[in-house]
Amino acid sequence: MEWLDILESHGQALLGPTAWLVLWTIVKIVVIAVPIILCVAYLTYWERKMIGWMHVRLGPTRVGFRGLLQPFADVFKLLTKEVVVPTQANKILFVVAPVVTLMPALAAWAVVPFGPEVVLANVNAGLLYVMAITSIGVYGVIVAGWASNSKYAFLGALRASAQMVSYELAIGFVLVTVLLVSGSLNMSEIVLGQTRGWFAEHGLTFLSWNWLPLLPLFVIYVISAVAETNRHPFDVVEGESEIVAGHMVEYSGMAFALFFLGEYANMILLSCMASIMFLGGWTSPIDIAPLTWIPGWIWLGIKTFCVVSLFVWFRASFPRYRYDQIMRLGWKIFIPLTGVWLVVVAIWMQTPWNIWR
């Protein structure tokens, strides 16, 4: 982009290379982080509206036009509530835990490409970075349960950590398979790898995306992402009939809101990763003029919105699993299945019918 090059040259001349680099990095972080936080806020609104429609209700309607200001009312309510720290709790860890849960979900966006050159840090190990940084969130859950000094919070934290680690393995095997077929850990190159092939050459780009040849893995990824974020129907971590809110049971006010933000930020991140790994990222589904005029970040947003809506649909449609059923699904079905499919794809790539050349 020429105007960005002009801005960079003027900035370096005015402030010097080092100061400009620091300032420009902060600007890029703000430009990415603020919309993500707004998306998290309005995802709560969309969830309540969608579930309301499925229940033949209206959902939020009172605050602003058609309830569009409801997220801001919720934030104001949580900001004005007192953060009560239990007497016997470890106060420092009690406060740190919500931050540890939220920050990895925001830091992972540093390597997410919104377009061919629109990325904060276009590193060659981007996929590895996302897998590593998102695994840190489980520590926030464990610390919250332990620091609360409550048997219910600790039981919820144990459930959450075991469930998150279990389904991280399944997601890891799926992403390793995508790495295998794309031949790169760079997320921009993974997207570009889905724009090649016979279908892409004939304008049917959506048939060259990874979702078609790796359809079973795509399904496993979406279900594992729901379990990874402790969302319904895998939300036994906060089973209201047993342990109330799980590891968050002792939290209130803005500390509770940070856990809430972390959960929804992870939903958006994993949905965006599904769009990049399987749905062609910023590319248009059909390579014809009206569709190719739409900016890539809008296509990525549409695909992410469709995937994240599946999370909401699952919540409104399915009953909660028992904890032993969840662990059995992860360890006895998903992990072996993804391992077998990884071997199948590796063998497939050695045959004359390799479609990823």
Swiss-Prot record:
Its main location: membrane. It catalyses: a quinone + NADH + 5 H(+)(in) = a quinol + NAD(+) + 4 H(+)(out). It is an enzyme of class 7 (translocase). It is a multi-pass membrane protein. It is found in: Cell inner membrane. NDH-1 shuttles electrons from NADH, via FMN and iron-sulfur (Fe-S) centers, to quinones in the respiratory chain. The immediate electron acceptor for the enzyme in this species is believed to be ubiquinone. Couples the redox reaction to proton translocation (for every two electrons transferred, four hydrogen ions are translocated across the cytoplasmic membrane), and thus conserves the redox energy in a proton gradient. This subunit may bind ubiquinone. Belongs to the complex I subunit 1 family. NDH-1 is composed of 14 different subunits. Subunits NuoA, H, J, K, L, M, N constitute the membrane sector of the complex. This is NADH-quinone oxidoreductase subunit H. The gene is nuoH.
